[in-house]
Structures are given as C-alpha cells and as structure tokens.
C-alpha cells in the first residue's frame, strides 16, 4: 500500500469515526455483542471508542469486527467505499457487508430538478464513454489483434513467395490467403465467414504459442533454480580459480604471508574440494559393506573410508574461521567489536599457524582498492558455483551475519517495550554502503527508510494501464507493432533462413542417396533381392506396400515443397521455420560443449565472460532437453495411447474392421481437434491403468514386486532433477520401453478380441455397433448420447460402495489361484507354501495323469521328507508300494522389500542365497559399478538417492521363472478379458431379456403392433442379439452394480465357511515377516448405509448431482435454453410484431412496404439488417449466459435442492415468463385471425410467419374488418409492451439517479452497522 492510500484510509477512518460519534444511536447498535467477543481481524475486544459490529452472516468466533480494522482491510483491497454504489463482500460468507449511509443535515427532501438533470447528463455521458471504451477495447483486442496477427502472417508469406494468391487483388489475398476452395466472392457474408475462420484459427494458434512460451519460461526458471544445476555447471567448467590463481589471489590479499603458508592454505582448500568431489563419486559406487561381506546388504554403509587425521580436520576448521577475503570482513569487525569507525588504509596482516585455536585468530583486512578491482561478473556468479573455496567462505560469513541479525531482531521482539533492532550502517573500505547488509536488513523487516535512505517513497512496480479512449487506441497500435515484430522474428526470418538450410540438407541427402544406390547395384545386392523375392513372394508385397504408402507420401511432400504446389499445407509452410529452430537448438547444444571443452573440475574456466556465455548456453540446452522429455511424457504418450486405443477398440466397435482409425473421421469439421480427443482418451486410459496398478500394489501383491513401476510415495522421485542429470539416450530408451509396455497391453489386450478373435475366428458381430447407431461426427446426437451415457454410467458405478470391494475380491482370488498353480505365491504374494518348493515325481504316466491322488496318498511322508530326483528313481525300484515322491527344486532369492528402493540398491538384488542368507555366488561389484557408470552418464554421481527403504526379503523362486512370470501376465490378461467381456455380454443380455419379455409386450398391447415406437424398439431388440448395444450394456452394468451387494455378501459367506473348513491335505502357509497392510475399503465395514436406507437410485442421484461438473453442465444447459427461448421470442416479436405493424401502417398509408418476408426479399437483399439483428441477439444471449454463470458461481456450493430451485426459477423468469408475456398474445391473435382466412390465401408459410405473410399477400383486394381489428390489436399490444417497458425502465432509472445524486452530493459518510437478525 502506498503513502497516498495510507493517508486516504486514515482520513476516511477519522471522518467516519467523527460521523459515528455525532450519531446518538450508534452505541445502541452494539448492545448484542457478548462479553469476551473479539475482532476476527485484530483479536481485540470491544471498547467504548471502538465497538464491535457483526455486519455479515458469519457466525461464531469470526462474527464480530472493529470498524477501523474493517476499513483497513477494505483499503487493502483497493476498494473506495465512499463512492456511490461501492459494495464490499465478506471473504468468508460472501455476503455484502452492511454500511449505513449518513447524509448531511441540509439535504432537501426533494432533489432540485436542475441538479438532477445535470448529474444525469454527466452520468449518461460518462457511462457512454466507458461503454464505448470497453466496447472498442474488446473489439480491438479480442477481435482485432488476432486478425492483425493473421494478416501479418499472410503478408509475410506473400513476401517469402514473391507473389500473392490472387494477383491484382491484394485485399482478397490478405483475407483468404492460400485457400484450396474455389475463387471466393467479396460479398459481405463471405468476408464475414472467412474472417470468422481466420479469427478462430489464429486464436488457437495464439493460445498454443502463449502456452509454449509460458512453459519454456517456467522450465528455464525452475532449471536455473535447481540445486543440481549449479553442480552441473561446476562439473563442466570447474571453479573460477585454479591452484595457481588461488595462490596468487591469497598472496595479493595477504601480502605479508610467507610462501610456505600460502602453499599450505592452497593445499588444504584443494584437498577439501577433492574430498567433496570423491563423496559425490561414491554415490555411484556400490556399498563398501557389500564388498567386505556379500551377505549383508540390508543396511549399506561405507566402511572402507580411511580415518581422517583429527589435526587435519581441526586445521581446516581453523581455516574456515579466517576472516573473509572480501568487503564483508570490515562489517563483521565493526558489528562484533564495537571498535572505532576508522579503517586502516595500509596492508594489515596476521600470521596463522597450523593447529592454532580459532579464539587466537586475528582478523585480516584487504585494501579497498583491491576489492574495487575485483570483477563484477565474478561477484555476480559466485553463488552459482558451490564448491569454490573462496565463495564457500563468503557464503559462510554472510550466513553467520544473517543468523546474528535474525537472532538480535528476535531478542528485541521478545523483550517487552524494547526498541526495534536496527543494524548499524555498514561501510566498506571505500566508504560505500554495503548492499548485502541492506538486503539483510530488509529481509528481517527493517523499514525501508532505515535499510536504504535513498529509496524512500518508492513503492512496488505497477503497470499503470488506464482505460481511456486514446490509451486503448495507443495500446492497440503498440500491439500491432509488437505483432509485426514478433512474427518477423519468429516466422519471417526463420523461414527465410530455413529455405537455405533445406537446400543444403536436401543436397547432402541426395548425395548420400545416390551413393547408396550405386553401392546397391555395385555390390550385387539387387541380385540377392531378386532371388529373395522369388523364394519369399511376401517380401515383394511388403516392399510394394512400403513404396506405395510411405515412400510415395514422402516423395509427394518433397515435390510439393520444391515445386511450391502445396502452398495451402500448414506442414509445408512450417517446415523451413521448424528446420531453422531445430538447427538452432542443435547449434546451442553443440556450442555449450564446445565452449566448455578443455575445462572441468580440475581445470576451471577463469574468464568471466566465457563463463557467462557457457551458463546461458548450458541453461538453454537443459531447457530444451527437459521440455522435450516433458512434452513426450505429457503429450506424446497420451496421444499415442489414444491412437492405439482408437485402432484396437473404438474403430472396430464404432466404425469398421476395414478401417485403421475412427477419430479423424468424426473430427472432419476441424481435424486438429482429433489430437485433443486422442490426448483425452490416452490420459484417461493411463489414469485408470495407474489406478488398477495402485489397487494391486496396495491390496494384493507383496511389497517390492512392482519396484520397476515407481510409486507416487517414492522419495527418490525427483522429476526435474532426474531429467537434468541422466543422459538423453537413457531417458528416451526408458520412455520407449514404457510406451512399448502400454502398446502390448492396449493392442493385444483389446485389439486381439476386436480385430481377430470375434470378427475372424468366431465370425461374430458381438463387438460391433449396428450401422444405424454408429456416430459419424463429433457434434452428432449419436456421439453425444453415447458420451453422456458412458459418463453417467461411470459416475453411477463409482458411487456404488460394493463394486470396488467386489473387484478387489475377484483379483485377489485370481492372483491367489494363478500364483498357486505357477508356484509363485512366495514371490508374488509373499506367502511361502512348502508344497510349492518342488514338484511331485510319479512312478509312471498312469499315476501322474489318472491316479495322481492315490499315488500321493501312497506316500505318507510325501512333503515331510523330500527326495532328490536320483533318490526318487532309486526308491521306485526298491519300494513298490510308494508311487510318488516330492522333489525340491528352485532357489531362494533376495528381492526388494519395498517399491521405493533406490536404483543402485536394486542392482544387488535377485541373487540366489542359502537358507542362512549366504550368497551362492559372490556379487560382481566391479561389473555393477561399470554398468551403473555407463547408465548414469556424465552427471550420474550427482544423483542423490534415498536409501531409507533399502531392504530385502528372501523368497522362493521356482525353475523357469521367466516363463512362469510371463505365463502369469498372460493369465491376468485372460481373466481381465473374461471379466470385461462377461460383464458386457451379461449386461446386454439382461436388459435385452427384460425389454423383450417385459416392456415390449406392454408397448404392443398399449400402442399396437404397427406403432412406430413398437416397431423401432422391436428392431433394436432383435439387433441386440447379434450386435453390441452400448446403451443396454451401460444400463445393465448399473443393474449389476446393485446385484453386486448380494454377490459380495455371498462371497463373504463362502469365505467364512472356507475359513472354518479343515483340509487334512492342505499344508499350512508360512507368511514372510512382512508388515501388515492397511486394509482400505473393507467389504463389510465400508459399505455405505445410504444405499440401504434411501435406495440405490437416491444414492446414485445424490452422487451424480453433487458433482461440480454436473452442476456446471446443468447451468450451461439452462443458459442455452434461455438463449434459445429469448432468440425465438425476439424473432417472433420482430417479425410478427414490430415489422408486421410497420408494414401494415406503411401499406395503409403509402400503399406499399419496405420489407418483405413472404417472397423472401428480406433474406436476400437486406443482409445488413439481418446482421444487426444477429449482433443484437448475440449480445442478449451473451448477457444471459453471463447472468447464468454469475448465478452458478454464487450458488455452486449450495445444496442440490436450492441449486435446482434457483436455476429453475432463473429459467422460468428469463425464458418461459418472457415467452408468455411477449409471444403468447401474438400467437392468440394469429389463431383468431387465421379462423377468418381461407386456406388458399395462406401462402409461403415456410419463409415467414402467417400474419406477416398474409399482410403482404397481394391477392387481398380489400382489407376486411377482421384484418383491421387484428393489426389494430397487434399495434396496441406492441405499443403497450413498449410503453410499459419504457415506463419500468424510466422508474428504475429515476430512482437510481436520485439515489446516486444523494450519495454523491449530500453524503456525509458511511458507518458500519449490524446485520438485522433473521426472524
């Protein structure tokens, strides 16, 4: 808040208190404030001079507030309550705060007419000026700027081409550009539609460019602020001071120091720096404990580090306490010692001996002139390079001073009635104020006048944009100039440069291609290819397909660019600029490596200018790298997943198996929208897949099985950090691997059923929608109906508290069954079953496949005394009564015990061990280190990983583990397919059965067999037996969600019986020492009783309607309904009312009329009037939508009944009531009029209204009395409506004007008052 606003607030508060004190009844307003009540702003109680008020609907401890506190809060929001009509709302209850206006004693009872008239005229002109300014600003900035952008783009394109699309017609070329359509006409409607298309395209382009710039800026800002970035810079260019420079700098700062001491200091600082670097390198290496004892890697630690000499450590600590080698040293001496302000001008020195105590150290000071000679660039970038020893000293001194300052300030605050602590003004050796000390003072709250006396009165930087007519035009001109310059920089120049680059690249590519062609023929490879095609004809077919589809398209684009025949293509137009940008990025990346070549941690770069250039280039390189990775992961992945879902699921179901994709066909009206559709589909799939993985991870499988899929709770997840330090190739390979896994799940999981199994193997259409119900456009009713049905079905299923526990029960059973059959219970579930630790060997095939149970019962010690395979074969020959033996196999293995283990720790896992946890084979740590070093890249040692959860379990792993694991994944896919297909077909069969045998007979009985509704429903029911019906599936799944309750209770009962049943043959399962999970969503205890009390439909209704999205959609629907009704009413009133009356009067008076609708002349020739009517109607509809939006935000948090009541009342007032008042009388008059007119006289009804058409019918020789009466009543009705509205508006205007004049001329002030209690 600036000084002027403080003065205004104080003056306003004093005036209001003065006015309030003059009122005799002010004190009575606060009699209801209870004792102990406090102000919610200052927490103070009420006094006689400063009472408490409750001016809003807040209750409880936040009910009351002081008037002075409220005025300060209002002033902080830049609201002037002294202005007429100023309104302040509470931030908590959003209710207007109650103020009482106090008028002057000499205010007359009636406002003088002259004053009222003058104020009204001034107010009218002021509002007209404001409306004109706002309208002009809206037109220029919202409409004009995008069109200017579009026209400059076309102008630059014509400059690059050297010709215009329509030679000789610059205006047409500027409006239409390079369009594929036929030669357009310069008519008003055609130009308007073209400008509308240009505006929509440019707006999308502008939004994407803004998003791109914001993303790049914030990523750049985050990167340079990341801690690891400064370490990466240090790794590339090292410290600014080499050992030689460090010695020379120490010698310059301490000229009295001998060479031996300088050598010692430089060596100690260098040793400490190397020690820090070695600690960083050790992060890549494996724990040293694993090298000493390969059997203990649970708690890794480094035991091989040699002990350090305590004297060396103490020497270096003494070194750290040496006074700073910069100007902060003088400030420290002045603050801590309270010595005189005189500073020595000569060269002072003190000798520091190794091992001396820090208490005996003497401060060293350097000359002020030497410090002034220090380069400014060196000071600017000191904080960016952490390991530099001198910078480390400076940072430590600055931190100590800051801590001392904070402590002193805190002590001063804690002492009662203590003066505010103000740091003394620090001066350097040259006598200048130290800016760092000023920053410290400002950081702890020192007033600006004390921190820097020269900066008094300077407030925050605010862009002062005043809304004036000339300013609007000036800002628009600035925007036009900026648009021209920006497009020239971002489009014109890069495209021009790209032309030359593409010529170079195409030339190089041609040379390489010709060389490859010559090599192909000279090496005789064409002979081998011809022989291969004769042996395998499919090779020739595949190469022909590649040539026709891929190579042909590439050649087509190449010819279109080189011959300039594809001027309308956006890709061809963007190719040169894109080439320039990619080349620039490559140059930046290469330049950063070139500038830093020859430098490193051992050999630092000392040139500050070169360091600055490298830091800029390196920051840009990192920004491009991170942006590419983020774009691939956030946009590329979802879009690619959406394309694969379209190929494997949506296209076969909603289109045809003969087609590849379906989404581009429904987005034909605007092809770029298909990318958004793909992104939405892919994002939703990835979200649901992540939820499925989370459910399995949390409730079913053992912790640590999915360690390769990072958990959201993983402390090692540092996205920006990992994106910076890991090589681009490694990260791209990980992304490709993730996308490959998604592709397997999508293409094989869905595409096998929709494109192979059902259409080809089963020859069935059960996974295909009937042709009549396939959506063809994204705006068609079929598509939107399917979309809404799927959305509400999802909401209903999620609202059921039985579906999720039932799904968890299903997958627990599946995983338990599959793991037991594959002997993976120990590895997957964490339950060690002894019977799975081997296999049973039978005497022969008869006992193995026919009499397996008898063979197992023949050995009473089958599992208690296992045998080897040789022992079993020997016993089969010796013991004839035993037909089966248990032979153990497999190994025990170390596996991660958590999903959030560190990456380096995982490298030591999955090794076989004995029962005593002894390694069967020593770890090859050197190979692991080398592999980690290759994978980590140049900055891998900077990767700091959390090792808190680095522990392991010992589990049993059977033979052929990989095959069994892949089989488990296949079984999971099989049972997921059974679940999805089973629910789909059961749901459709259920609803089809109910409709065929329940609803259809009733409809046939009520409506008859030939009724259209019955026939259509009967055809749909017949088709549903052989085709997929999405509506039946959705309704049936909702019904099954109700049945899920009974299924869940039945399975719980079965589980209870199974738990009490005793199986003599079952061997007890031994669970690992694994912590118990938190069982969320327990099936019995977590069941929502709302469904049992109110019924499932009320629960579903409550869950759906409580959604903010549903409320928003309801608001949009009501706004559209109101807009449609208001448009229809306006059209009827205009045509059947106003223009009909106008035509009747002009025909009766002048014998003809200016406007005709019956012959469609008004539509053909009077386009300007139609445009004006459309603009007025659009403004009215916009106002209606804005009112509905305000109503939605005002009531979005209310209950559903109040929200429905409010929106329905708004629809009634704005829609139906308006229609009844204005349209119903006209319709009644029209019906009465038509009773007296023969059918032959009613012509051209399709082009206009009946009454208006009949009024212009030339077949009427004379006007009948009924016609005169009709038009007379119509004129009377319209006149009455007009004068009634004018009267209402005049009364409202008069009351508002009188009140505004009172508030502006006679207002003495406004005082706070209590909110009246609701009775």
UniProtKB/Swiss-Prot annotation:
Pathway the protein takes part in: Protein modification; protein ubiquitination
SUPFAM superfamilies: RING/U-box (SSF57850)
Lipid bilayer topology: Multi-pass membrane protein
SMART domains in the record: RINGv
Biased composition annotated in UniProt, kind: Low complexity: 291-306
One Gene Ontology CC term in the entry: nuclear inner membrane
UniProt keyword annotations, A-Z: Acetylation, Endoplasmic reticulum, Membrane, Metal-binding, Nucleus, Transferase, Transmembrane, Transmembrane helix, Ubl conjugation pathway, Zinc, Zinc-finger
Cytoplasmic side, ranges: 1-131, 225-468, 513-626, 682-739, 798-965, 1041-1113, 1190-1213, 1292-1319
Disulfide bonds: none
GO biological process: ERAD pathway; protein ubiquitination; retrograde protein transport, ER to cytosol
EC assignment: 2.3.2.27
Binding site for Zn(2+) 2: 56, 58, 90, 93
Zn-finger region bounds: RING-CH-type: 31-100
Sequence similarity: Belongs to the DOA10/MARCH6 family.
Function comment: E3 ubiquitin-protein ligase which accepts ubiquitin specifically from endoplasmic reticulum-associated UBC6 and UBC7 E2 ligases, and transfers it to substrates promoting their degradation. Mediates the degradation of a broad range of substrates, including endoplasmic reticulum membrane proteins (ERQC), soluble nuclear proteins and soluble cytoplasmic proteins (CytoQC). Component of the DOA10 ubiquitin ligase complex, which is part of the ERAD-C pathway responsible for the rapid degradation of membrane proteins with misfolded cytoplasmic domains.
Identification of the protein by name: ERAD-associated E3 ubiquitin-protein ligase DOA10
């Amino acid at each position: 808040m600036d000084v002027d606003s403080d003065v205004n607030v104080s003056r306003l508060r004093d005036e209001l208190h003065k006015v309030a004190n003059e009122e005799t009844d002010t004190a009575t307003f606060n009699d209801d404030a209870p004792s102990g009540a406090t102000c919610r702003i200052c927490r103070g109680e009420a006094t006689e001079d400063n009472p408490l008020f409750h001016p809003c609907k807040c209750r409880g401890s936040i009910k009351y507030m002081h008037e002075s506190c409220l005025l300060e809060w209002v002033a902080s929001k830049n609201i002037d309550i002294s202005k007429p009509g100023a309104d302040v709302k509470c931030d908590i209850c959003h209710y207007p705060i109650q103020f009482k206006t106090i008028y002057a004693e000499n205010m007359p009872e009636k406002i003088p007419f002259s004053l009222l008239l003058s104020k009204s005229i001034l107010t009218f002109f002021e509002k007209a000026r404001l409306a004109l300014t706002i309208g002009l600003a809206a037109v220029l900035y919202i409409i004009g700027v995008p069109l200017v952008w579009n026209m400059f783009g076309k102008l630059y394109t014509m400059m690059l081409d050297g010709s215009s699309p329509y030679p000789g017609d610059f205006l047409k070329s500027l409006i239409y550009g390079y369009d594929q359509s036929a030669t357009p006409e310069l008519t008003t409607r055609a130009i308007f539609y073209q400008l509308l298309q240009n505006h929509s395209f440019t707006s999308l382009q502008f939004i994407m460019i803004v998003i791109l710039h914001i993303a790049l800026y914030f990523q750049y800002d985050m990167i340079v602020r990341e801690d690891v970035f400064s370490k990466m810079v240090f790794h590339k260019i090292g410290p600014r001071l080499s050992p030689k420079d460090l010695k020379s700098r120490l010698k310059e700062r301490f000229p009295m120091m001998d060479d031996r001491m300088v050598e010692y200091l430089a060596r100690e600082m260098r040793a400490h720096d190397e020690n820090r670097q070695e600690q960083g390198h050790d992060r890549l290496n494996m724990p040293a404990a694993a090298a000493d004892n390969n059997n203990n890697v649970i708690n890794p630690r480094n035991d091989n580090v040699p002990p350090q000499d305590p004297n060396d450590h103490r020497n270096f600590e003494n070194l750290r306490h040496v006074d700073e080698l910069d100007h902060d040293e003088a400030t420290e001496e002045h603050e801590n010692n309270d010595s005189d302000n005189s500073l020595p001008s000569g060269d002072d020195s003190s000798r520091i001996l190794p091992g001396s105590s820090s208490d005996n150290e003497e401060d060293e000071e350097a000359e002020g002139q030497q410090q002034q000679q220090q380069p400014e660039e060196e000071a600017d970038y000191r904080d960016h390079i952490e390991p530099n020893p001198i910078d480390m000293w400076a940072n430590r001194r600055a931190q100590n001073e800051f801590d001392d300052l904070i402590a002193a300030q805190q002590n001063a605050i804690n002492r009662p009635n203590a003066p505010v602590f103000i740091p003394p003004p620090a001066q350097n050796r040259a006598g200048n104020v130290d800016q760092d000390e000023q920053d410290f003072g400002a950081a702890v709250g020192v007033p600006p006048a004390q921190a820097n006396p020269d900066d008094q009165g300077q407030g925050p930087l605010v862009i002062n944009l005043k809304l004036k007519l000339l300013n609007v035009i000036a800002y628009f001109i600035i925007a036009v100039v900026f648009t021209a310059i920006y497009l020239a920089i971002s489009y014109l120049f890069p495209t021009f440069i790209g032309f030359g680059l593409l010529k170079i690249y195409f030339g190089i590519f041609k040379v390489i291609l010709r060389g490859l062609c010559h090599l192909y023929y000279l090496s005789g490879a064409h002979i081998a290819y011809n022989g291969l095609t004769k042996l395998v004809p499919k090779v020739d077919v595949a190469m022909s397909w590649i040539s026709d589809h891929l190579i042909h398209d590439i050649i087509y684009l190449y010819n279109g660019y080189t011959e300039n025949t594809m001027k309308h293509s956006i890709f061809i137009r963007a190719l040169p600029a894109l080439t320039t940008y990619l080349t620039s990025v490559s140059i930046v990346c290469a330049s950063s490596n070139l500038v830093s070549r020859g430098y490193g941690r051992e050999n630092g770069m000392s040139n500050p200018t070169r360091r600055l250039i490298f830091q800029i280039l390196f920051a840009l390189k990192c920004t491009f790298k991170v942006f590419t990775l983020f774009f691939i992961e956030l946009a590329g992945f979802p879009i690619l997943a959406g394309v694969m879902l379209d190929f494997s699921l949506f296209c076969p179901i909603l289109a045809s198996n003969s087609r590849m994709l379906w989404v581009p066909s429904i987005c034909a009206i605007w092809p770029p929208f298909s990318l958004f559709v793909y992104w939405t589909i892919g994002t939703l799939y990835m979200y649901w897949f992540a939820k499925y993985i989370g459910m399995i991870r949390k409730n079913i499988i053992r912790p640590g099985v999915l360690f390769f899929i990072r958990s959201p709770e993983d402390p090692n997840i540092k996205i920006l950090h990992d994106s910076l330090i890991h090589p681009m190739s490694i990260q791209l390979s990980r992304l490709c691997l993730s996308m490959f896994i998604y592709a397997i799940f999508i293409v094989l999981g869905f595409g096998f059923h929709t494109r192979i199994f059902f259409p080809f193997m089963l020859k069935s259409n059960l996974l295909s929608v009937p042709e009549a119900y396939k959506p063809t456009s994204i705006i068609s009713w079929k598509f939107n109906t399917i979309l809404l049905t799927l959305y509400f079905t999802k909401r209903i299923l999620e609202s059921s508290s039985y579906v999720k526990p039932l799904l968890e029960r299903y997958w627990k059973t599946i995983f338990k069954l599959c793991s037991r059959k594959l002997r993976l219970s120990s590895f997957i579930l964490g339950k060690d079953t002894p019977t799975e630790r081997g296999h049973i060997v039978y005497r022969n095939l008869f006992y193995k496949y026919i009499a397996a149970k008898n063979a197992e019962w023949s050995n009473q010690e089958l599992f208690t005394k296992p045998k080897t395979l040789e022992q079993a074969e020997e016993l089969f020959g010796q013991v004839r009564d035993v037909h089966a033996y248990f032979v153990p196999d497999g190994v025990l293995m170390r596996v991660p015990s958590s999903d959030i283990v560190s990456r380096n720790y995982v490298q030591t896992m999955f090794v076989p061990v004995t029962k005593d946890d002894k390694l069967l084979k020593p770890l090859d740590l050197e190979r692991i280190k080398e592999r980690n070093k290759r994978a980590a890249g140049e900055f891998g040692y900077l990767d700091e990983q959390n090792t808190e959860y680095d522990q392991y379990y010992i589990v049993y792993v059977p033979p052929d583990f990989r095959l069994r694991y892949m089989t488990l994944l296949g079984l999971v896919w099989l049972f997921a397919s059974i679940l999805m297909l089973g629910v789909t077909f059961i749901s459709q069969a259920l609803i089809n059965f109910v409709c065929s045998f329940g609803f259809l007979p009733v409809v046939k009985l009520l409506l008859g067999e030939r009724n259209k509704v019955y026939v259509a429903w009967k055809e749909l029911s017949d088709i549903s037996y052989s085709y997929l019906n999405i509506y039946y599936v959705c309704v049936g799944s909702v019904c099954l969600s109700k049945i899920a309750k009974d299924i869940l209770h039945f399975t719980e009962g079965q589980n209870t019986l199974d738990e009490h049943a005793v199986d003599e043959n079952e061997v007890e399962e031994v669970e690992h020492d694994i912590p118990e999970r938190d069982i969320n969503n327990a099936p019995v205890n977590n069941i929502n009783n709302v469904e049992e009390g109110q019924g499932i439909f009320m629960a579903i209704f409550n869950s759906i309607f409580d959604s903010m999205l549903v409320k928003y959609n309801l608001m949009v629907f009501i706004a559209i309904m109101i807009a449609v009704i208001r448009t229809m009413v306006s059209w009827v009133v205009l045509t059947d009312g106003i223009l009909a009356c106008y035509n009747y009067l002009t025909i009766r008076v002048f014998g003809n009329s200016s406007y005709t609708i019956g012959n469609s002349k008004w539509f053909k020739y009077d386009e300007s009037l139609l445009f004006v009517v459309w603009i007025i109607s659009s403004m009215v509809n916009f106002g209606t939508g804005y009112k509905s939006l305000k109503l939605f935000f005002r009531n979005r948090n209310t209950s559903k009944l109040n929200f429905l009541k409010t929106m329905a009342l708004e629809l009634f007032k704005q829609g139906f009531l308006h229609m009844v008042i204005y349209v119903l009388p006209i319709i009644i008059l029209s019906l009465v009029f038509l009773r007296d007119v023969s059918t032959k006289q009613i012509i051209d009804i399709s082009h206009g209204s009946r009454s208006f058409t009949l009024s212009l019918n030339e077949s009427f020789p004379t006007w009948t009395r009924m016609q005169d009466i009709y038009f007379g009543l119509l004129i009377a009705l319209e006149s009455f409506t007009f004068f009634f509205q004018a009267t209402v508006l005049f009364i409202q205007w008069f009351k508002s004007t009188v009140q505004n004049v009172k508030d502006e001329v006679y207002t003495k002030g406004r005082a706070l008052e209590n909110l009246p209690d609701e009775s």
